[in-house]
């Protein structure tokens, strides 16, 4: 029976030395706990959202230098981790497997998960299975699963996949990610499914998680409270970005400070974050939370209090299309006579929807919203809504 340590760690962007020190502590702890395999997330050494720093040869050479140091620690334990591999001015987003002088590499396919991914990294087709501890291991990223093997999946994103039938060990990092909408903290999810049985599941929990590969089936635990996730995000931002404050003209800022019992969030600081997902001028601390979650956490008392624009913005973030927004609203209309009445007049409804959404689409998605395209959207949505009534 193989004892495994799955590590969900706070990966700090660009701070290789600090990240590797954290990895070395985990490796030493796992050895003392008698684990045969320890698995770290994707880009555990360097972080992922580094932008143009990926084109800096000196940084990539520096980040790559840590791979040999980590591999040297794989004497009594096999180590899996993710980092850049730099050779001859080529950069490979790589998963590594090391054990007693054996070093195996798997290069992530260019799938667009990272903005400008094809600009920063090179492709390389390596796909042999790895034999270790009586297991055939398929080492990869996201949900590239191979049946009839143990799939070790590395991830470092704000999206994660769910347990499924194949034998799979999935490890995601707790990493701070940020875009035009605002900061998010990836979920740090670790799970292991063995022949259809869930033998481990954890999320939003930093550290080494130990379990036996062929252990007893376990139940998925209760979700981490939303206020705790907000608290973790605030801690991560403070740790990596330094002091910040909340935009006080957003009433939600006052509620969050009160919920977290952190009045210092309302004091003046060099950086300012908003708390409304429909205000492009202030990146929102809530960009990683859905509107129902914000209601559950007590930021809003109801959908009505949150307002129609925030509802539209939330639905668009989930569906990534205006048709998707309309589809969700149609499903909600049965419990909302007001919404039902508005949808009965497609032309007026679409005009209101576009008036609220166009500024957000320009600010967050940087779409080229010409007059011709806006007219197309209006005609398309009205036509689509008309077909739903038939």
Q: Model features per residue range: what roles?
A:
Residues 1-390:
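Enzyme catalytic cores with a strong preference for nitrogen-chemistry domains
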């Amino acid at each position: 029976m193989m004892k495994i340590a799955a590590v969900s760690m706070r990966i700090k962007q660009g701070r290789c030395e600090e990240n590797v020190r954290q990895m070395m502590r985990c490796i030493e702890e796992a050895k003392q706990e008698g684990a045969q395999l320890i698995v770290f997330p994707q880009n555990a050494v360097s972080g992922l959202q580094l932008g143009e720093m990926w084109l800096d040869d000196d940084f990539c050479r520096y980040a790559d230098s840590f791979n040999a140091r980590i591999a040297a620690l794989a004497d009594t334990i096999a180590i899996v981790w993710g980092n850049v591999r730099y050779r001859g001015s080529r950069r490979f987003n790589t998963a590594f497997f090391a054990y007693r002088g054996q070093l195996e590499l798997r290069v992530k396919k260019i799938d667009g998960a990272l903005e400008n991914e094809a600009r920063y990294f090179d492709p390389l087709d390596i796909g042999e299975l790895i034999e270790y501890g009586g297991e055939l291991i398929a080492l990869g990223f996201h949900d590239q699963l191979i049946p009839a093997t143990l799939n070790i999946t590395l991830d470092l994103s704000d999206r994660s996949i769910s347990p499924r039938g194949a034998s799979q060990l999935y490890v995601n990092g707790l990493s701070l990610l940020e875009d035009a909408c605002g900061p998010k903290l990836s979920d740090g999810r670790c799970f292991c499914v063995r022949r259809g049985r869930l033998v481990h599941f954890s999320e939003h929990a930093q550290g080494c998680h130990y379990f036996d590969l062929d252990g007893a089936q376990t139940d998925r635990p209760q979700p981490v409270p939303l206020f705790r996730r907000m608290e973790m995000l605030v801690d991560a931002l403070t740790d990596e970005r330094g002091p910040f404050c909340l935009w006080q003209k957003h009433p939600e800022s006052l509620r969050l400070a009160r919920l977290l019992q952190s009045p210092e969030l309302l004091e003046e600081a060099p950086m300012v974050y908003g708390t409304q997902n429909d205000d492009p001028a202030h990146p929102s601390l809530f960009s990683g939370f859905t509107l129902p979650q914000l209601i559950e956490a007590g930021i809003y008392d109801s959908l009505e209090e949150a307002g129609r624009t925030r509802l539209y913005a939330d639905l668009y973030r989930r569906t990534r299309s205006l048709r998707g927004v309309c589809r969700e609203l149609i499903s909600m209309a049965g419990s909302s006579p007001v919404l039902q009445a508005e949808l009965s007049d497609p032309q007026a409804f679409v005009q209101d929807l576009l008036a609220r959404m166009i500024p957000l689409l320009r600010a967050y998605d940087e779409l080229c919203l010409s007059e011709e395209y806006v007219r197309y959207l209006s005609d398309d949505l009205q036509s689509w809504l008309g077909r739903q009534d038939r």
